[in-house]
């Protein structure tokens, strides 16, 4: 199952580390993580609108979305969650998984 990782990137100096930790955790749980932070780093300077178009395309390919802690503070992460729900994607929240719960 492919899972898109969503969380705050702008104004978050630790985003690379947070996304990588989520990626590793998802792999341990036998998910195939899709880490948009890896793509952003390797792309030329893009507008926020261009980045969101890429993110939506990646999200469409996935079976679900994994919401990192603090996602509510990110306009982009909120938009990704809304889009994922409109596509009936499975939604996983980091805070529940940290407590050992397996679902929303």
Regions found by a protein language model. Name each.
Residues 1-104:
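Conserved catalytic or regulatory cores that recognize and/or transform ribose-phosphate-containing ligands
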């Amino acid at each position: 199952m492919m899972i898109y990782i969503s969380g705050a990137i702008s104004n978050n100096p630790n985003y690379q580390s947070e996304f990588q930790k989520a990626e590793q955790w998802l792999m341990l749980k036998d998910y195939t993580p899709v880490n948009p932070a890896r793509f952003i780093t390797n792309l030329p300077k893009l507008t926020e609108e261009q980045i969101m178009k890429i993110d939506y395309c990646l999200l469409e390919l996935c079976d679900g979305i994994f919401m990192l802690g603090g996602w509510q503070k990110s306009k982009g992460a909120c938009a990704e969650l809304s889009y994922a729900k409109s596509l009936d994607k499975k939604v996983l929240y980091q805070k529940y998984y940290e407590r050992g719960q397996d679902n929303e």
